[in-house]
Amino acid sequence: MFTPEALSLAEGLVSPAYIAQGSQATARRSKLLTSLLSERRLPRVGWDDASIESFLHEAAMMDSNTFLDNVGVGEREARVHSPLVRRRHYGLAHGIGRSGDVAAEQPKAAGSSLLSKLTNLLVGDAFRVAGLEDAGPALVLPLATGMTLTLTLLAMRSLRVAKLAKLDASSMASANDARRATRVIWCRLDQKTCVKAVAGAGLELVVAPTRLVGDQLVTDLEAVRAAILDESRGGPNAVCCVVSSTSCFAPRASDSLVEVAKMCAELDVGHVVNNAYGVQSRSLCALVTKAWRRGRVDGVVQSTDKNFLVPVGGAVLVSPARDPALTDAVRKTYPGRASIAPSLDALITLLSLGAAGWRAKLDAREDAFEYMRARLRATAEAHGERLLETPGNPISMGVTLSALERDLARIDRRASEREAGDDDGKTSRRGGGKTSVSFFGSMLFSRAVSGTRVVVPGKTQEVGGITFHGFGASHDAYPVPYFTAAAALGTTREDVDAFCARLTKAFADFRKKAEKDAKRFAAAKGDPGAENGAENGAEGRDQTLL
């Protein structure tokens, strides 16, 4: 607004010395934008909110719906009824992309197009700072991780089918048989999202089981290879791609990305990595970099909310710089225009953080992880439990609930002895009974602890038409019940301290509840001494525990 001419005229109203001082302040803010547009990477130091809002408002004024004299007579003219909605979106209502390309420029929305391109560039630079090197252009999509995986798999299949179509005449018979390329080899990770992403793409999921090594679940490379080479189901030509994962719930470790990437290169099949919240871990970023340097990785999908501290709704696809074909295909596969909201959230956050702030967040998360591991280990041992050893997982950790389960079994035996008059009661509290180990998660949640997961062996669940045994553990028969916690981006030492304090109370309260449940159960069965017996048992619990 304040052009040199306007500033000169302003000197007729306010002292020139004051106007000069004010113009220096506005010029400094203008230089922030000049540097951003010239360097096209994260600013060294984060911007203040006023500078960010000023930039967004000016960008919005470059869109046709904010032109002073614009007359829109089309079916889509970015009309917004509510002033509140307009302010929420800074007047940016055209969205991004065009029908043929989600990253294409819009003639009526120069400002929105500029913001979208800058977001992709800043996200790519944030990846670089986090340790993801040799990456091609990043593509921010207004879809959460699961739907982005579905879109990526659809694009992957189209590339695969196009490649099979180029087979020479001597191979045409086998190519025709396998051209559908509908099989997705998936390294098991018990989250419904992954299964539904494959089903949503109309593809066939082939589950490669995990392998238990110590406490940790790792990639069964032999199972992955066998699934790819299965000639009874078409062999490699029938495979759309392999889907591996980096970030996951303990005791599941990150997949052996380098080995899987080498296998995919050797067998000439695609490879998509689910890196949902892996950007926040430097070690996982380094692992992805190593994988696409040494083998085949077609694309990597990651969430915006988990990695950049923004609301749910966006994800980022990136391919290696030497082969960005999959990202290009997804960009051109997206139907119609897209919402700018997830891109705008990421842009605002990254401008606010700057490179220094982003590094500080990454450092703080790693510190929180080590602190949580030490505190959880001590808390677990104080209650007869132990921290699961999962060195291949740099974000999540697990704690056994074995001692708690043994306590419940002891309480059950005592109740059964009263009820039956003998010592044959050995009811398991894993999956039912008066108080179940699985209730421990509800007890934590009721104490305002969110994010923990209690996994009890033996659960069978069907997801997307596939039956999973031991669902939740990513293994058919994980040997112990456990709960998980994660030191994700934004977690502080204060969070960890509060969590461990509430965890200690939950352990004590859970055992008290189990004793009360046993007392009520026995009383309902007509045992007149049940109440006193349960109270005596509670008093002596510390001596008989474990």
What are these model-predicted stretches?
Residues E105-A109, P137-P142, V243-S245, T400, ...:
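Short glycine-rich or small-residue beta-strand-to-loop segments that form or flank ligand, phosphate
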Residues T3-P4, E11, Y18-Q21, T26-S35, ...:
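Conserved C-terminal alpha-helix-loop-beta "cap" of PLP-dependent enzymes
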Residues Q24-R29, P43, W47-S51, S256, ...:
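Secondary-structure junction/capping motif
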Residues A93-D101, A208-R211, A486-A488:
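Short loop/turn segments at strand-loop or loop-helix junctions that form parts
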